[in-house]
UniProtKB/Swiss-Prot annotation:
Region annotation Disordered: where it falls in the sequence: 127-165
Protein name: Genome polyprotein
Enzyme Commission number(s): 2.7.7.48
Annotated InterPro entries: DNA/RNA_pol_sf, Poty_coat
Molecular function in Gene Ontology: RNA-directed RNA polymerase activity
UniProt keyword annotation of Nucleotidyltransferase present: yes
Biased composition (Basic and acidic residues): 127-145
Keywords of this entry: Capsid protein, Nucleotidyltransferase, RNA-directed RNA polymerase, Transferase, Viral RNA replication, Virion
The record's account of how the chain is modified after translation: Genome polyprotein of potyviruses undergoes post-translational proteolytic processing by the main proteinase NIa-pro resulting in the production of at least ten individual proteins. The P1 proteinase and the HC-pro cleave only their respective C-termini autocatalytically. 6K1 is essential for proper proteolytic separation of P3 from CI.
Length: 391
């Protein structure tokens, strides 16, 4: 809008009003700051600014804002300050005289010698040197407390909800101080404070699952090998997951894998899938475990569906079909019955299987030197003759 010859970028009045409607402030002071922010944004809309000021005056008469106003903690933005903020022109003495005259009229019962002004910044003057010494002292105290954290735990002396009169409910330590912890030269190797808050996801540190970097490298390698974009790769991953549910993730797989496009079969080479799968394809597909589990549940909601992995093990309980694939990821939340069924199927799948480190050597010929000496009296080339005796 144009104000006093200047074009000023402004929000729409509705956006300014939405600032007033913001009521998720944690402290009453934050609510007052939001109203002052709306005043700043409303400058240029004279009617809107007037209504905001009247609303602010009404708010300061309500609890708990009335107490903040009495303590001088309620912020105020004058018209002169807003004008100077937007135009960059400093306030003149005539404009400031208006506020000075009103202030004197409100305090006409006091003379100049009795009038006392209180500013919001009521902090004492700070000595930089003393402040730095205080910080160094506090830092040394914290370091000393950190060294003694493994030896002594200071009890909390604050009154809490468990306190009744002069009696307090004892608090048990999460980690006992009597534990035998590893130490070097008398200093503990563990940070107990960090250990109490270190609760990583089991999947993130499990050796049975490929790391996130390995999964990303596999995805990027397969995508480049198939020469597809990210959206097409999503469809390929869908088909690969369903194919692996039926056919497994053995390292002996070779040839091609298949997915359906309507009634038409579409084949893809398995070589890129296996080549970029580090450490193994089963560890890569473990990231798809929960998605595969949900997919089997979805199929069973419309028809009886048992993956081939379960059919081969003669699994008759369709309630366990969701666990009948070889890249299923066991977790702490897996039911005991499902865990037993999965482990039995896994044991049956690997029963009698043997892996040979070396195959048959292709160079099967033997080069031997025959050192046997025969004479004309020998019976044949394999038998000797000595004085009529045959050996």
């Amino acid at each position: 809008i144009k104000k006093e010859g200047l074009w000023i970028p402004k929000l729409e009045p509705e956006r300014v009003v939405s600032i007033l409607e913001w009521d998720r402030a944690a402290e009453p002071e934050h609510r007052l700051e939001a109203i002052c922010a709306s005043m700043i944004e409303a400058w240029g809309y004279d009617d809107l600014l007037n209504h905001i000021r009247r609303f602010y005056l009404w708010v300061l008469d309500q609890a708990p804002y009335k107490q903040l106003s009495a303590e001088g903690k309620a912020p105020y933005i004058s018209e002169v300050a807003l004008k100077s903020l937007y135009t960059g022109k400093p306030a003149t003495s005539c404009e400031l005289e208006v506020y000075n005259k009103i202030h004197q009229e409100q305090h006409d019962e006091f003379d100049d010698s009795q009038m006392k002004f209180v500013f919001q910044s009521d902090k004492e003057k700070l000595n930089v040197g003393e402040q730095q010494k205080s910080k160094d002292k506090e830092s040394r105290q914290r370091d000393q407390e950190g060294e003694n954290s493994n030896r002594q735990i200071i009890p909390d002396r604050d009154i809490n909800a468990g306190t009744t009169g002069t009696f307090s409910v004892p608090k048990l330590k999460k980690i006992s101080g009597k534990l035998s912890l590893p130490k070097i030269k008398g200093k503990g190797l563990l940070n107990l404070d960090h250990l109490l808050v270190y609760v990583p996801n089991q999947d993130d540190i499990s050796n049975n699952i490929a790391t996130q970097e390995q999964l990303e490298a596999w995805h990027e390698g397969v995508k480049n090998a198939y020469e597809v974009d990210d959206q097409q790769m999503e469809i390929i991953c869908n088909g690969l997951m369903v194919w692996c549910i039926e056919n497994g993730t053995s390292g002996d797989l070779q040839g091609e894998w298949t997915m359906m496009d309507g009634e038409k079969q579409v084949t893809f080479p398995l070589k890129p899938i296996l080549d970029f799968a580090k450490p193994t394809l089963r560890q890569i597909m473990a990231h798809f475990s929960q998605a595969a589990e949900s997919y089997i549940e979805f199929r069973n909601s419309t028809e009886k569906y048992m993956p081939r992995y379960g059919l081969q093990r003669n699994l008759t309980d369709y309630g366990l079909a969701r666990y009948a694939f070889d890249f299923y990821r066991l977790t702490s939340k897996t039911p005991a019955r499902a865990r037993e069924a999965h482990m039995q199927m896994k044991a049956a799948a690997i029963r009698g299987k043997s892996n040979h480190m070396f195959g048959l050597d292709g160079n099967v010929g033997t080069d031997e030197e025959n050192t046997e000496r025969h004479t004309a009296n020998d019976v044949n080339r394999n038998m000797h003759h000595i004085a009529g005796a045959r050996f």
